[in-house]
């Protein structure tokens, strides 16, 4: 059985499923942004819709890849055998902060998920999750996108 959790579906699902995800994803993102003095993000239904479509496609196809040729920034998270909370998803990405050196504006290892979260110019986010018994896929889209080569996130 497949499940999808995103706004725009049935009102009952939106009330029981999306509201907490929207609220919790935004709170988790904004908590990380506040740590470095960056303004909070606002939720975008458009970005959420695009995230939902991509999460569903990834789940159905058994894939895990960024949306090709997207004009948005994007973070992906995959969980197998357990469900993750919005806070766990964002903290997984934010954990890359240890790999980012703000003085040199360089990463030691992976840090692009973290820098996208704290990218000062990014103003909006929209996220969704799609899952089944074996796997769930989280997608967050950001606008304007971050991780512009040569620029600092904050």
In which residue ranges do the predicted regions lie?
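Positively charged n-region of N-terminal signal peptides that target proteins for export
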Residues: 1-4
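Hydrophobic h-region of N-terminal signal peptides that target proteins for export
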Residues: 7-17
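Generic marker of residues within folded, mature protein domains
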Residues: 7-9, 23, 66, 117, ...
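Generic signal for short, ordered secondary-structure residues
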Residues: 11-12, 29-30, 97, 106
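Short, well-ordered surface patches within globular domains
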Residues: 17-73
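Disulfide-stabilized extracellular recognition modules
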Residues: 69-72, 80-154
């Amino acid at each position: 059985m497949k499940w999808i959790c995103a706004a725009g579906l049935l009102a009952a699902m939106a009330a029981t499923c999306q509201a907490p995800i929207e609220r919790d994803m935004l709170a988790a993102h904004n908590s990380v942004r506040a740590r470095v003095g960056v303004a909070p993000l606002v939720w975008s239904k458009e970005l959420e819709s695009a995230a939902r479509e991509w999460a569903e496609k990834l789940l159905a196809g058994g894939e895990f890849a960024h949306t090709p040729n997207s004009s948005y920034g994007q973070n992906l998270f995959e969980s197998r055998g357990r469900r993750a909370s919005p806070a766990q998803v964002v903290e997984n990405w934010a954990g890359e902060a240890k790999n980012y050196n703000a003085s040199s504006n360089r990463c030691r290892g992976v840090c692009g998920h973290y820098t996208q979260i704290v990218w000062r110019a990014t103003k909006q986010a929209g996220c969704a999750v799609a899952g089944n018994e074996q796997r769930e896929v989280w997608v967050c889209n950001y606008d304007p996108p971050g991780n512009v080569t040569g620029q600092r996130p904050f």
